[in-house]
Amino acid sequence: MSVDVAIIMGSQSDWETMHHAADTLEALGISFDARIVSAHRTPDRLVAFAKGAKAEGFKVIIAGAGGAAHLPGMAAAMTPLPVFGVPVQSKALSGQDSLLSIVQMPAGIPVGTLAIGRAGAVNAALLAAAVLALYDEALAARLDEWRKAQTESVAERPSNEA
């Protein structure tokens, strides 16, 4: 059985952000595989992964990166699969450097760029789910239920309780 979504990141420290994508996919019943694939420290691993991702059965790639953040763009350059980039918040510039690196792709190499940090990781998983749900009615129903539960979790009035 193939795995639908690949979650790749440049280093172990990126997992602090990227596990939110994994948690969201898991909550929706979507199969995923998380890997460390650094554009700078393991370039051969990146090339092998990106060029082989479709053959492995992946349908979507979520790529998280901080700092120079070349991973999403380099992966997108080597695969026909949709790539969603998540800027990981960095200490130096709070992830703004990563955001600009990921979002400024040249025409012809698209990367769907999300928000910095946790929100971006969750939304990348939700976008991946939406893509997969186009061809999976059961997943579409689970995604609708997830959104309904999110809506129902929002209070109508503010509270002093924590």
Swiss-Prot record:
EC nos: 5.4.99.18
Class of the enzyme per the UniProt entry, highest EC level: isomerase
Catalytic reaction annotation: 5-carboxyamino-1-(5-phospho-D-ribosyl)imidazole + H(+) = 5-amino-1-(5-phospho-D-ribosyl)imidazole-4-carboxylate
GO biological process: 'de novo' IMP biosynthetic process
Pathways involved: Purine metabolism; IMP biosynthesis via de novo pathway; 5-amino-1-(5-phospho-D-ribosyl)imidazole-4-carboxylate from 5-amino-1-(5-phospho-D-ribosyl)imidazole (N5-CAIR route): step 2/2
A Pfam family recorded for this sequence: AIRC
GO terms, molecular function: 5-(carboxyamino)imidazole ribonucleotide mutase activity
InterPro entries noted in UniProt: PurE_ClassI (IPR033747), PurE_dom (IPR000031), PurE_prokaryotes (IPR024694)
The organism's place on the tree of life at top rank: Bacteria
Residues that, per the record, bind substrate: 11, 14, 41
Keywords: Isomerase, Purine biosynthesis
Presence of the UniProt keyword Secreted in the record: no
Stated family: Belongs to the AIR carboxylase family. Class I subfamily.
Name of the protein this chain belongs to: N5-carboxyaminoimidazole ribonucleotide mutase
Native source species: Brucella melitensis biotype 1 (strain ATCC 23456 / CCUG 17765 / NCTC 10094 / 16M)
Biological classification of the source: Bacteria, Pseudomonadati, Pseudomonadota, Alphaproteobacteria, Hyphomicrobiales
